[in-house]
């Protein structure tokens, strides 16, 4: 039945044998490969480029998702105290999302203390200690199926040590500097050339990208930290009005005890970036 269905759908396709597929069961892929001379291509990039310019309705949905995320983050900020686990704190955002009609989370990125360096460790039952940094990335698919993707770094007790203040300030400077650069028609290559330079002792721990698109999840574009000849990514595109992008920063010294993760979500307007979230970037 599965093979017959694929054959029926494939018959009207033109002589062009390039077929881009977003999602397909293995039976369908096998049938296409075994019965037709199609060159199967991953459709993800094409679809994400097609939806990179957001409509007014999409912006409304995204703002609703961000409002829900901010409500949950504010409750997390109020609740954070030594003795609770990372998962207890993280559950507050999940509960808020579901209570307000939200959907799901792409990741489990909330970490405390030494788990904040390097980044990308998973939220766990680790007990948060006095004076520790707590960093998180929402990656939250909220109401109406749109993504709220912002990051904040708090500190238990709300008083940063000198070292914590240093890395938090660098991450803050990184986001603000790069956000100021972006305007319609700026090429990804030019952005990468002009972007804020990470401290040398933090480079090996850098976040995978400086900028990424966002819509119903993380999307195109994806602007990496370039290598010397710009061969490690696609820098050929340009920023366009009504794109929505996230500006990322992670500051964690190689071998350091803690790291700071900050990120904000912006709408590209004719005059530059318009911050979609109202939560202060320097909230600790």
Regions flagged by a language model, labelled:
Residues 1, 162, 233-234:
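Short, contiguous acidic/charged loop-to-helix segments that flank catalytic cores in large enzymes
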Residues 10-105, 159:
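Flexible, acidic/His-enriched mid-domain "rim/lid" segments that flank
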Residues 40-44, 51, 55, 59, ...:
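Short, acidic (Asp/Glu-rich) active-site segment that either coordinates a divalent metal cofactor
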Residues 170-179, 274-284:
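Glycine- and charge-enriched low-complexity intrinsically disordered segments
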């Amino acid at each position: 039945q599965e093979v017959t269905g694929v054959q029926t759908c494939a018959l009207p396709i033109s002589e062009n044998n390039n077929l881009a597929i977003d999602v397909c069961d293995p039976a369908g892929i096998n049938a296409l490969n075994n019965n037709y001379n199609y060159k199967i291509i991953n459709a993800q990039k094409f679809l994400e480029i097609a939806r990179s310019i957001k409509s007014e309705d999409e912006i409304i949905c995204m703002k609703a998702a961000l409002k829900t995320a901010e409500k949950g983050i504010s409750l997390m900020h109020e609740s954070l105290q030594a003795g609770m686990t990372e998962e207890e704190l993280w559950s507050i955002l999940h509960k808020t999302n579901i209570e307000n009609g939200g959907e799901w989370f792409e990741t489990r990125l909330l970490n405390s203390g030494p788990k904040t360096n390097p980044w990308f460790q998973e939220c766990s039952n680790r007990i948060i200690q006095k004076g520790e940094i707590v960093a998180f990335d929402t990656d939250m698919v909220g109401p109406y199926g749109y993504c709220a993707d912002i990051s904040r770094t708090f500190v238990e007790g709300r008083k940063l040590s000198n070292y914590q203040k240093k890395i938090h300030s660098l991450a803050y400077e990184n986001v603000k500097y790069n956000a100021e650069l972006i305007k319609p028609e700026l090429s990804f290559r030019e952005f990468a050339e002009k972007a804020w330079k990470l401290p040398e002792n933090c480079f090996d721990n850098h976040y995978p990208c400086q900028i990424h698109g966002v819509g119903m999840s993380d999307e195109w574009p994806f602007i990496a930290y370039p290598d010397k000849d710009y061969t490690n990514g696609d820098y050929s595109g340009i920023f366009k009005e009504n794109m929505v992008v996230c500006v990322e920063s992670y500051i964690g010294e190689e071998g350091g005890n803690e790291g700071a993760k900050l990120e904000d979500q912006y709408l590209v307007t004719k005059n530059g970036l318009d911050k979609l979230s109202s939560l202060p970037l320097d909230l600790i």
